[in-house]
Amino acid sequence: MAYSPLPADLAQPKPATEHTKKTQARVREQLNFDDRQSFDDAQRGFIASIDPITIKRPDGHITFDLEQLSFLHGEAPDTVNPSLWRQAQLNAQHHGLYEVCDGLYQVRSFDIANM
C-alpha cells in the first residue's frame, strides 16, 4: 500500500477559482513571457546530460526521474502562478553538466540544489 498524506478525494486537483484566474492573468499581463532570454542564458555552457534522465541505485531502482517533470513543457495552468511555472521550467528543463566559466563546472537539476 502506497503512503499518501491526503485522502484520495483531497489529493485530486481542483479547478482555479475566479479570483485565482484573475490573479494569474494579472501576472501574465505584468511580465513579458515572450522574452525567452532566460532560457537561452540557462542553456549557456551546457556540456552533457544523462539519457535517460533518471538516476538509479545499484539495484536498478529509480530514485530520481526528471521525466516526471515533463508536464512543465506546457503553459502554466490557471491554478499556478505563471512566474513560478517559468522558474520551474528553467530548473527542470536545463539539466546536466555546465561550464559556468573557465574551469568552473556545475551540475544542474538532478535535485533541488545546484552542485
Question: Where are the regions that the model predicts?
Answer:
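Metallo-beta-lactamase
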Residues: A2-D102, V107-S109, M115
